[in-house]
A protein has these predicted regions:
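Hydrophobic alpha-helical transmembrane segments of multi-pass membrane transport/permease proteins
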Residues: 1-7, 26-40, 146-152, 203-210
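Transmembrane helix segments
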Residues: 2-3, 131-175
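Membrane-interfacial helix-loop-helix junctions in multi-pass membrane proteins
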Residues: 17-18, 103, 155-210
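Hydrophobic alpha-helical transmembrane segments of multi-pass membrane transport proteins
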Residues: 23-97, 143, 151
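Short cytosolic juxtamembrane segments of multi-pass membrane proteins
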Residues: 219-226
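Short helix-capping/hinge motifs at transmembrane helix termini and TM-loop junctions
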Residues: 1-10, 38, 94-106, 132-135, ...
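Hydrophobic alpha-helical transmembrane segments of membrane proteins
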Residues: 10-51, 115-128, 132
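Alpha-helical transmembrane segments and their short interhelical loops
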Residues: 68-144, 193-217
Length: 226
């Protein structure tokens, strides 16, 4: 497989952190994106597997005087809070543990806040969509078959711009919402590394959030009323 550096250097990771630093600089936003994604999905999908199980615990949840959509939205918001806390916990670990220096610098706090909030809500919406789309006993299988591949293709361990020399893959990963989580945090925390345009990141995070929230709420209502 060709080096993502285009063969200009012996190391495929050298030069990714264009403004200095090492692989730790590239990895920091990716690890935070993984923490947000896994925390958000697990906080929604795993409880739903139990609630939609044989005991149908979900029937007790929807007896509250709220619309079904409000119950689904509560799950997304609650998981988003957990995702923000997970990202806050991972940041110091990913910043101080690597042996190579990590060059993190926030140039726009509002952009960082927008990315974290949108990514956290998106992870919860993805968890709701997964939790309402598969049978409870298949949740564990989904983590192995779906979650892990989209993580490795989510620009976690490399910036999206590093895929320039593998053009078909660079275009193909654009359907992966985790790409925009990683790239958004990369643009906010390590702007010296290559990243997508900020406008594109915010637009695609919003698009996937709306799409997955709609799909998740529709699936949640269907499973509750079935």
């Amino acid at each position: 497989m060709p080096h993502m550096s285009g063969g200009a250097t012996m190391s495929p990771v050298a030069g990714m952190a264009g403004g200095g630093g090492g692989f730790g600089t590239v990895l920091l936003p990716g690890l935070m994106a993984v923490a947000i994604m896994f925390s958000g999905i697990a906080a929604v999908a795993l409880p739903l597997a139990q609630e939609f199980g044989i005991t149908r615990e979900i029937d007790d949840r929807v007896m509250c005087p709220l619309p079904i959509a409000a119950v689904a939205m509560e799950k997304i918001i609650f998981s988003a809070i957990q995702s923000v806390l997970a990202a806050a916990l991972v940041f110091p670990l990913a910043y101080y543990i690597p042996s190579t220096p990590v060059l993190a610098h926030v140039t726009s706090w509002w952009f960082l806040g927008a990315v974290v909030v949108l990514a956290s809500l998106l992870a919860g919406a993805l968890g709701l969509t997964i939790g309402t789309s598969v049978q409870p006993k298949q949740i564990g299988l989904i983590f192995g078959v779906v979650i892990m591949p989209i993580t490795f293709l989510g620009c976690v361990y490399y910036p999206w711009t590093a895929l320039t020399h593998i053009r078909w893959l660079q275009i193909g990963v654009l359907v992966n919402p985790i790409v925009y989580m990683s790239e958004g945090l990369r643009a906010a925390l390590t702007p010296t590394t290559g990243h997508m345009p900020e406008v594109m990141i915010l637009a695609m995070l919003t698009f996937f959030l709306v799409l997955l929230t709609w799909a998740g709420m529709r699936g949640f209502a269907r499973r509750v009323l079935s």
